[in-house]
């Protein structure tokens, strides 16, 4: 209200459309839009390629045996657990090992020093994913204890490595596991692989996550972005409100 008499200019990369916080309701239609697709075509942003990786338990769901107990000794409710429950309501250790293995496989394909962000369902899963990736990449972890690092709000040691991760000159950390912390406000110009292993509800959050890897740094060998998707989040690329198509998608099971 104080600035109501002034001309107000709004600029955003991910406009909000929440009830009570809708950019279009407040400012009206944008007077100028520069889309992600146009930025890629003009050579300012990195083109991206999607690998959609579907795990059997995600496709078929999982039902515990009658009387089956969890790691804490509590009986698991007998019902069909869908992909949306896994990670949030239910942790399947074998599934996490499969995810870590496939991340490692991709890094062997694209370069094991490719800076990578792994988005997990919560901070506990981010911690276990870090441990699994350390075990599967022990040779490089011997060279640096920060080859795989968890960066979450509650981990002070991990947060200390954030500046090193986003630096174009620091090689470590290489793989970062997180939940929410790195989805916004982090400019990691050399991030070459984004791994999605969490349910993403909103288009805004999806754009923010993809945006962590859309920077170009040709002088550092960053020409494009790889996206490894375990949660079918990249189906949002087909949404008419998303501006920018990926290169051909590959699917694995």
Residue ranges, per PLM feature:
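Signature of the SF2 helicase/ATPase Hel1-core->accessory helical subdomain module
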Residues: 1-51, 57, 188, 193-208, ...
């Amino acid at each position: 209200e104080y600035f109501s008499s002034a001309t107000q200019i709004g600029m955003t990369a991910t406009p909000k459309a929440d009830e009570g916080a809708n950019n279009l309701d407040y400012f009206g239609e944008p007077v100028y839009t520069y889309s992600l697709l146009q930025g890629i075509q003009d050579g300012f942003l990195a083109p991206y390629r999607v690998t959609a990786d579907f795990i059997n338990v995600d496709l078929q769901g999982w039902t515990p045996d009658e009387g089956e107990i969890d790691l804490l000794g509590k009986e698991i409710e007998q019902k069909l657990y869908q992909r949306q429950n896994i990670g949030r309501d239910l942790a399947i250790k074998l599934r996490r090992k499969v995810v870590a293995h496939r991340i490692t496989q991709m890094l062997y394909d694209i370069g094991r020093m490719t800076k990578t962000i792994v988005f997990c369902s919560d901070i506990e899963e981010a911690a276990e994913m870090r441990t699994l990736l350390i075990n599967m990449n022990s040779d490089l972890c011997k060279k640096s204890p920060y080859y795989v690092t968890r960066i979450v709000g509650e981990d002070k040691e991990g947060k200390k490595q954030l500046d090193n991760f986003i630096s174009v000159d620091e090689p470590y950390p290489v793989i970062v596991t997180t939940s929410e912390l790195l989805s916004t406000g982090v400019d990691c110009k050399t991030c070459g692989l984004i791994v999605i292993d969490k349910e993403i509800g909103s288009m805004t959050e999806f754009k923010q996550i993809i945006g962590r890897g859309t920077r170009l740094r040709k002088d550092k060998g960053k020409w494009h972005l790889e996206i490894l998707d375990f949660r079918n989040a990249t189906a949002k690329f087909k949404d008419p409100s998303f501006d920018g198509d990926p290169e051909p998608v590959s699917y694995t099971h």
